[in-house]
């Protein structure tokens, strides 16, 4: 069964900027899709760097003119990566990535933010290899739009005031994430 972890907060609206998915440069985009590649290196066929270690990712964004997969030049845990960008303005320490920059409002003291987090794994339980890895979150405000992030990243996002590091199981296997922004006027 789907384990639901949900919290809704309605506080003061003026503390939240427009919600949007963010790319590697911190620019607002309508959507992005990320594929964290599985570990490519074996003892018989060693591959150096993030690709060999299972820390490389490729992405698409609504702003890419050619709409082709782009291999990121940085590992997924880098503060400027797509998942890590969220963290550049997050109030606690977790390795940064575009997902993290996108989620910064979740960890701020913004009082007008509604958030819903769902995960088919218990926050501090064992990783299951038999479930569908149903994970995601919704962030929304009355006037600043919303974000829906669907992903398969283990134990993500962390609870506020908890640290996060990309898990070893996440390095071995491929992971996906998709972020969609909505405008409050739509």
Language-model segments: which ranges?
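HKD-type phospholipase D/PLD-like phosphodiesterase module
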Residues: 2-186
């Amino acid at each position: 069964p789907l384990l639901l972890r949900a919290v809704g907060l309605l506080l003061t609206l003026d503390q939240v900027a427009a919600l949007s998915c963010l790319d590697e440069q911190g620019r607002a985009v309508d959507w992005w899709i990320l594929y964290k590649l599985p570990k490519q290196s074996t003892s018989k066929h060693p591959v150096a760097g993030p690709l060999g270690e299972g820390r490389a990712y490729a992405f698409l964004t609504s702003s890419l003119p050619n709409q082709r997969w782009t291999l990121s030049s940085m590992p997924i845990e880098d503060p400027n990566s797509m998942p890590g960008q969220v963290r550049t303005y997050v109030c606690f320490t977790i390795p940064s990535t575009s997902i993290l920059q996108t989620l910064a409002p979740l960890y701020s003291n913004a009082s007008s933010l509604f958030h819903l987090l769902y995960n088919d794994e218990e926050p501090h339980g064992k990783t299951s290899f038999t479930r569908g890895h149903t994970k995601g979150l919704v962030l929304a405000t009355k006037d600043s739009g919303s974000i829906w992030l669907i992903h398969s990243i283990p134990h993500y996002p962390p609870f506020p005031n908890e640290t996060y590091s990309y898990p070893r199981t996440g390095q071995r296997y491929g992971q996906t994430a998709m972020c969609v922004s909505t405008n409050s006027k739509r």
